[in-house]
């Protein structure tokens, strides 16, 4: 009887051992379960995390297109206003407006050409007001620009007085030494101008003076030194 019980116990033990996973160490099943839990948590976090869409890139194109459309509309409205204003102008105003637009176009063309050639302008503004010279070359450019500007008024009767008034105001802030240097420069210019003006007119002469020494043939004695003068009158008439 005891043998039967022992045999039955061994049989049950074998069945239980066969069902167990002999390749697993103790606690490995718990690790597998834990790893599975972590994987599930990561998948849930990925699902719960907000999807990062390329919304800035997608929205940038429509936004840029809308801005371009708006700018184009504003340009059209501005052109329409300018056309209406131009139509309401007098012929003189229209001519002045055309000249202004032409000047702006020329300035833009010049600016484009300078940028193409890599030429850096002396200033960021336009015209004399935009010039801010610091070097000798830049001051020379400023002087030329002012000279060209004033050249438009040379024919005016007030031009001479304007220059005198301008010089007084400009030289008032200079020292006496600098004024003397400027005066020397003007004096030299005056002399050069005077030479040019005199060269255009024939010189007038009232008479020619001739001095000579006469010698008697065969002798070394000087008889006399005399002077003959030819003037506007005749010597014979004077003798008579």
UniProtKB/Swiss-Prot annotation:
GO cellular component: eukaryotic 43S preinitiation complex; eukaryotic 48S preinitiation complex; eukaryotic translation initiation factor 3 complex
Keyword line: Coiled coil, Cytoplasm, Initiation factor, Protein biosynthesis
Keyword NAD part of the UniProt annotation: no
A Pfam family hit: eIF3_subunit
Basic and acidic residues bias: start-end ranges: 46-56, 72-81
Superkingdom field: Eukaryota
GO terms for biological process, alphabetical: formation of cytoplasmic translation initiation complex
Keyword Lyase: no
Quaternary structure note: Component of the eukaryotic translation initiation factor 3 (eIF-3) complex.
Family: Belongs to the eIF-3 subunit J family.
Name this protein carries in UniProt: Eukaryotic translation initiation factor 3 subunit J
